[in-house]
Design a protein with these regions (language model features):
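Active-site Asp-x-Gly
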Residues: 55, 188-190, 196-257
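Short helix-adjacent coil turns
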Residues: 276-282
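Short secondary-structure junctions
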Residues: 10-18, 71-73, 253
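Short acidic/polar mixed-charge low-complexity motifs
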Residues: 15, 39-43, 207
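ATP-binding pocket architecture of kinase catalytic cores
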Residues: 20-142
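An alpha-helical support segment within catalytic cores of ATP-dependent transferases
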Residues: 1-17, 92, 107-114, 118-119, ...
Length: 295
C-alpha cells in the first residue's frame, strides 16, 4: 500500500494526512506508520498486511472500548478501525522503554529508579483487573476459568514440542510448574496479557500514563500481568509491585510471587506458541533458540 493509498483511505474517514510518513516494518500482521494531519496532530497508523485481519481488528476495538471506561490511564483511541487501516492519535508521553529489533538496543525514556512507577502501575493493574466478567462476556472476549488455565498451557507445550522442539531442562520445569497445585490461583480476572515496560507509557518522572497493544486481553491468571515486570525490573521490584497492588485493593493469593517467576520463566514457551501460530521464519528461529533447540 502506497502513501497515497493510505491518504485516500484516511480521507474516506475524514482524516487528512500529510504525505510525510515514517514506517516500522517489523510487525507480522500490521505495518506501523507515523503521520501528521493538516492541524499538526500526530497519528499512529496500523496497516494490515493481510485481508483476513478484520475480525482481529474488531476484537481489539471492543477491548479498547471496554478498558477505556475503567482505566484512569490513556489507551489508544481508534478513530479509524477498518479492515484496511487503523488510526489513532499518538498517546501522550513515551513507552517506559523502547527496543530496537535490529540492533537490540534498549532506550529508557524514564528514570528506571523512579519511585513513581510501581505505585502508578499497581493502580492501573487494580483498575484493569477489577473489570467485571459480565462486561467481558457481553463483549464476546475470551474467558478462562481457573480450571482451564493449566490445560491450555499443557496443550501449547505439546504443540510447541511437536512443531519446534524443546530442551529437556525447560520441559521438565514447565511440567513441574503445571503439576504444582499450590502455585495456581482459584480465581481468574481480566488481564492485558502482554504487559511489560515497552507497552506502558510514562511521564519522564515515571508516572504511568498509558497502556498500548491490547490484542491479547482476556480473563485468565493475573500473574501474566506481573511477569513482564520481573523480566525488566527484577525480583525485588516485583515484590514491591505485588505489595503495592494488594495495598491498593488488588486481589492476590499466597503464591502470586512464585507463580509470577514461573510464568516469566515460561516466556520461551509463549514465544514458541506465537512462532507456530504466525509461521514466521524469523520468529521460528528465535523461538527455537530460546527453547534450547538446535536449528
Amino acid at each position: 500500500m502506497t502513501i497515497k493509498d493510505i491518504q485516500e483511505i484516511a480521507e474516506e474517514h475524514g482524516l487528512l494526512l500529510s504525505g510525510d510518513m515514517k514506517f516500522n516494518e517489523m510487525g507480522i500482521d500490521f505495518k506501523v506508520g507515523f503521520a501528521t494531519d493538516q492541524d499538526g496532530k500526530q497519528w499512529l497508523l496500523r496497516i494490515p498486511r493481510r485481508n483476513d485481519l478484520g475480525e482481529q481488528i474488531e476484537k481489539e476495538k471492543c477491548i479498547l472500548q471496554l478498558v477505556k471506561k475503567h482505566l484512569s490511564v490513556q489507551v489508544p483511541d481508534w478513530q479509524i478501525a477498518s479492515p484496511k487501516l487503523v488510526a489513532y492519535p499518538l498517546l501522550e508521553d513515551k513507552p517506559a522503554l523502547t527496543f530496537d529489533a535490529i540492533t537490540y538496543e534498549v532506550t529508557w525514556n524514564m528514570n528506571q529508579e523512579s519511585p513513581n512507577y510501581v505505585p502508578s502501575l499497581a493502580k492501573a493493574l487494580v483498575e484493569l483487573h477489577s473489570i467485571d466478567e459480565k462486561d467481558v462476556v457481553e463483549n464476546g472476549l475470551k474467558i478462562l476459568k481457573p480450571n482451564e488455565v493449566r490445560p491450555e498451557i499443557a496443550d501449547r507445550l505439546q504443540l510447541v514440542k511437536s512443531e519446534l522442539g524443546i530442551c529437556t531442562e525447560l520441559e521438565t520445569r514447565y511440567r513441574k510448574w503445571l503439576d504444582n497445585d499450590k502455585l495456581w490461583p482459584d480465581f481468574t480476572l481480566f488481564i492485558h496479557g502482554d504487559l511489560y515496560a515497552g507497552h506502558v507509557f510514562t511521564s519522564e518522572e515515571g508516572v504511568v500514563s498509558g497502556i498500548i497493544d491490547w490484542s491479547t486481553a482476556h480473563v485468565s491468571d493475573i500473574s501474566h500481568d506481573f511477569s513482564g515486570h520481573v523480566n525488566v525490573f527484577g525480583e525485588e521490584s516485583l515484590k514491591a509491585l505485588i505489595t503495592e497492588y494488594e495495598k491498593q485493593g488488588g486481589k492476590v493469593w499466597d503464591n502470586l510471587y512464585e507463580q509470577t517467576l514461573e510464568r516469566a520463566a515460561a516466556a520461551p514457551l509463549a514465544y514458541g506458541f506465537f512462532a507456530v501460530e504466525t509461521q514466521d521464519e524469523t520468529h521460528i528461529r528465535g523461538a527455537k533458540s530460546q527453547l534450547g533447540v538446535e536449528s
